[in-house]
Amino acid sequence: MLKLSGEGLRDSYHSRRDQIALKNLQSDVTEAKSDFTKETLASQNTKMISSIVISQMIDENKSRENRASLPLPCAIAQSRAHHAKQSLANRSGVNIHRAFALLPGRLGIPAPSDERGPEAELPPKEERPCGGPRRGFASITITARRVGPPARALVWGTAGDSLCPKCRAEDTLFQAPPALANGAHPGRHQRSFACTEFSRNSSVVRLKVPEAHTGLCERRKYWVTHADDKETSFSPDTPLSGKSPLVFSSCVHLRVSQQCPDSIYYVDKSLSVPIEPPQIASPKMHRSVLSLNLNCSSHRLTADGVDGLVNREPISEALKQELLEGDQDLVGQRWNPGLQESHLKETPSLRRVHLGTGACPWSGSFPLENTELANVGANQVTVRKGEKDHTTHCHASDHANQLSIHIPGWSYRAVHTKVFSGSSKRQQGEVCMTVSAPPVEQKPTRHFLPIGDSSPSDDCLSRDLSEPTERRHQSFLKPRILFPGFLCPLQDVCASLQEDNGVQIESKFPKGDYTCCDLVVKIKECKKSEDPTTPEPSPAAPSPAPRDGAGSPGLSEDCSESQQTPARSLTLQEALEVRKPQFISRSQERLKKLEHMVQQRKAQRKEDLRQKQSLLPIRTSKKQFTIPHPLSDNLFKPKERCISEKEMHMRSKRIYDNLPEVKKKKEEQRKRVILQSNRLRAEVFKKQLLDQLLQRNAV
């Protein structure tokens, strides 16, 4: 799960009342019913997502009010949209069961799976703001699960153009080619998508889930990603070999509210693909691409320089899009996903994340990515990626806007930030980050270099055009390279994907009159050759700060549980040998030095002992005295001296006085002296007393 959070992003033109509208769009049916039946029989072994559960969390205190304030036209449009899809389902024979299940307790909208009605077309424009307190989404959770088809499940149509003009303009990447629409081969590429739209205070949240159905035709795989680009499609007329890549594509469109400054959005999107036994004995390479396009729009100034609150309309309506170079007409196009995920069958998943915001924060322009893959051998797939980012100037608020992307299990590798100052009212910066999980082997990342004055030392570069009031444009080169970055979500690191730790990508807008920023995330390249395994699902999520986002799905949980095998992790010694051989060599040199020092000390001690043993017999024979121990405190050397006669008498007297007989004799003598003195004192006292008595008698 990929979590994105935005802070400090508010919009002043939103209404006061909370409105929720559900709009479901469905494409037209352009193929014959027999072709659908063949495709259904060919894809019986393919495990696909059978239902999408969308839940939007709203404050409990306002849930009843939102349920009561739901406009009648929205409910009618919702019912008509589902009636249209039901009628399309009755016209087609595709056995793909899908149902939208919303939480009625939360949204106050009944589940549309059992409704029926005439076919209708939804208007693409957004709802006007209504009165009510201004509040943003607390959280939006989008989940995809594999469940059994219900008794009255909707049968969705496939291929062709969308009923909604928005989706027709936005879904250019997943158009089915004309070569497959003629029904010449039963194992062709089929497409079905679901588009829901929630309108709340002029802020729309949309989810589009297109999926590529892969059929089997004489054990050959056919892959189509773009109708307009001939290099991205493999026609059944030219069958591919067993080494060709098999691609499954899916995307999620999400436009979030700008009201809540501290909002967190969770997107959990899974893609189920068929897993077959390996056709060859040798292991293969498995690669997948995860692309994130985050677009921001300003909520302060419009194209004419007036605040959006004055015009009472979002800036996306006022700003028109245009490209410097390209062959597609983007007028009226509101979003182009630019998302593609490729899987080489029966191998572990390797993922690359390329996240770019070529537009200003909260502007009305969006990036366009065209990913083209070509077969270059057994296990080599090349990508030619071109980005045409068109940006507009926007007013930067005084407080620092912050965009944080949390991807569990990923960690920082490198951060490069470069801000360029152009005119007095414009600044443009670009942040390039390298993110990676614990793969088995990593290689240096090769980055895309933009057109213009680019230096080889910079990972990314921003251009500032000279026009002070017109929109600026960016155009990236389209080099043919081997996937610039990969990520290996192997089973040994799947536990870390469930933890809360992750990658945080923060882009703080510099202060100035107008600010534009580009945010690019690239993942280091990783290659792993092993037995076929099925990766865990690796969903991605758009952030609340940008206007639109795209997330790439992973495989379903049931496939991963039944097919995935544990991958052996590298030990510490093997990892050091691969990544830091110098560390091992230096450690070995230090150990050798320590051993040499120990041997030298032992030899020195032996020499000292030999010298002492040779000197001891000479000293003992010559002089008789004690030799002090070298480690003792008594390190002085005793000297030979002669004792005088007086000293000898004094010593003898001390010895004599300390004898017990002598001590006793001295004690008796002392007592006799005391007794004699006491007797003398008694006699003197008697004499004095007698004299006094005689004198008194005389008187």
UniProtKB/Swiss-Prot annotation:
Residue stretches of biased makeup (Pro residues): 534-545
Subcellular location(s) per record: Cytoplasm; Cytoplasm, Cytoskeleton, Microtubule organizing center, Centrosome
Coiled-coil regions, chain positions: none
Record EC number: 2.3.2.-
Molecular function GO labels: ubiquitin protein ligase activity
Keywords: Cytoplasm, Cytoskeleton, Transferase, Tumor suppressor, Ubl conjugation pathway
GO biological process assignments: protein polyubiquitination; protein stabilization; protein ubiquitination; regulation of centriole replication
InterPro entries per record: ALMS_motif, C10orf90_N
PANTHER family the record matches: (E2-INDEPENDENT) E3 UBIQUITIN-CONJUGATING ENZYME FATS, ALMS1-RELATED
Subunit text: Interacts with HDAC1; the interaction prevents binding of HDAC1 to CDKN1A/p21 and facilitates the acetylation and stabilization of CDKN1A/p21. Interacts with p53/TP53; the interaction inhibits binding of p53/TP53 and MDM2.
Protein name (Swiss-Prot/TrEMBL): (E2-independent) E3 ubiquitin-conjugating enzyme FATS
Organism: Homo sapiens (Human)
Source lineage: Eukaryota, Metazoa, Chordata, Craniata, Vertebrata
